[in-house]
Amino acid sequence: MEKSKGRKSVSQATVENCMENPGLELMEGGNLEQRYTQEEVTQGHSLEDGLGHSSLWSRRIFQPFTKARSFFERHAGLFRKILLGLLCLAYAAYFLAACILNFQRALALFVITCLVIFILACHFLKKFFPKEQLRCLKPLENTHLNLWAKRVFVGLSVVGLILWLALDTAQRPEQLISFAGICMFILILFACSKHHSAVCWRTVFWGLGLQFIFGILVIRTEPGFNAFQWLGDQIQIFLAYTVEGSSFVFGDTLVQNVFAFQSLPIIIFFGCVMSILYYLGLVQWVIQKVAWFLQITMGTTAAETLAVAGNIFVGMTEAPLLIRPYLADMTISEIHAVMTGGFATIAGTVLGAFISFGIDASSLISASVMAAPCALALSKLVYPEVEESKFKSKEGLKLPRGEERNILEAASNGATDAISLVANVAANLIAFLAVLAFINATLSWLGEMVDIHGLSFQVICSYVLRPMVFMMGVQWADCPLVAEIVGVKFFINEFVAYQQLSQYKNKRLSGVEEWINGEKQWISVKAEIITTFSLCGFANLSSIGITLGGLTSMIPQRKSDLCKIVVRALFTGACVSFISACMAGILYVPRGAETDCVSFLNTNFTNRTYETYVCCRELFQSTSLNGTNMPSFSGPWQDNVSSLRNLASCCDLYTSTVCA
């Protein structure tokens, strides 16, 4: 150490005196480097010996853990099955306990469990019996049914339909008007067909038949009606959770009183949920099954059927994305079917907004599902296939999966994507309502010039569309109001139309008088259902630009074909909704037990309701004035001691000639 210090001091002195000696410095540097290298080697040997001993001890300590990990890796499949079996047993115990304690309370759990079991069963059948399943999935045109058997089937179907109509309409002959309406729309569309001789009537009749059968299951049968009523109630309960998020952001006052903060957030919530379901593959699975069923029955091609089936769940611009790789190679007839499906149905995201208006959820769901086969049928009636399609078999058609990497990203993207839809809806409502107000003001001004008072766009629609609405099955007294709504939907927007329908429904439920100063204030329940079906679609003039913009961005090379058929597809989609309304008019029957008005009026006079109005009207009709004497009553009110008191209470709420 002293020598080194000495050298260091000499060297430093040399540098300080500017008398450097390169040879001395080089020799000293070499000696230092050699010494330091020998020390590093010695220290390295000792470090390696230490690390060797520690590594040996660590291997001995962690050897049991390493063996355990390798054991679990070798038997990972077995442990996964054991864990899955334990979870299934635990869920089975929970499921049985819930059903035994209160089956009505566990009904939703029961339905979800049955759906999951059905999906798993289909998955295992496809996995273990692929050949047998593919044999069953062949379209019906490939089966060996001879012409005689087909004719017998068609004949039996026609005879069955005639017998059903004869027996069913014997009690309600007004339903024949709706049947005549279906025939009228089909004849009009056939007259407008592009190729009359190329119409495949099998596709047309199968589509209408499937729509009719589904309507019977949903509207007429008690289990089907209760199932869809229950489904609609569950969707309403589910959508009500939107209030929690919107109230936190906007506050309770805005959410309860302002439309934009009450209904539009539902679109964001529903878009988030749909994105999650799409990420999980449930939406694609349902679309493929619906498309397969429509294809084997109606004989349509795979690409157009997938798009139309997808329109049940997604909108007119999202459904073509499902078949985007195949759009360029599709025939004009197939593209026409895709367009018609978009115009004839509504998106799942806006379904929640319509339900928030107070529109019957089960009717909206039924109309959306019933529109799919009818859209394919009428599309092939208006624009039959005359080209050779490349998609006669569904092999090779794959629905795209979401690009999200996890479920949280899917939820976030779904909510974010819905913002543009919310902005679009809000902007359209502002613009179209303002335009409608301007049109009404202009028409009113023009009418005043020739002493025509109260002229408006709605009044014109009520006269022009009244015969068509009557052919759907609407009572003549309700036709003016329904015709107004249908005209607003086609020329303005379906949101405005559904909002107007909800106003009429709210008036009826709140017990407003049906006629005030000669003007009808609301429509009947049957008219509400028929109107709900007739409005269930995007077939309005503003949708032409949306459809052309979406499809042109995907297949710009076929812009001329798109522009050539878009108007034809628009009117076809509108007729799909009208025929669905006719189906509802044929199948509608009043439901629910009739109100015992005598007991009802004896116990319920707290506020105005629809039942209060009906019972008071019945009491007014049963009352006879006898000059200055006490009024007399007939029917169930004749021997009722409280009839006079109930009459006085009804006169406090409503006006009638017997109240004078």
Swiss-Prot record:
InterPro entries the record matches: C_nuclsd_transpt, C_nuclsd_transpt_met_bac, CNT_C_dom, CNT_N_dom, Gate_dom
Modification Phosphoserine, positions: 46
Record localization: Membrane; Apicolateral cell membrane
Keyword hit for Nucleotide-binding: no
Key word Transmembrane present: yes
Bilayer topology annotation: Multi-pass membrane protein
Gene Ontology, cellular component aspect: apicolateral plasma membrane; brush border membrane; plasma membrane
Main location (coarse class): membrane
GO molecular function, one term: purine nucleoside transmembrane transporter activity
Similarity annotation: Belongs to the concentrative nucleoside transporter (CNT) (TC 2.A.41) family.
Function (record text): Sodium-dependent and purine-selective transporter. Exhibits the transport characteristics of the nucleoside transport system cif or N1 subtype (N1/cif) (selective for purine nucleosides and uridine). Plays a critical role in specific uptake and salvage of purine nucleosides in kidney and other tissues. May contribute to regulate the transport of organic compounds in testes across the blood-testis-barrier.
NCBIfam families recorded: nupC (TIGR00804)
Identification of the protein by name: Sodium/nucleoside cotransporter 2
Gene: Slc28a2
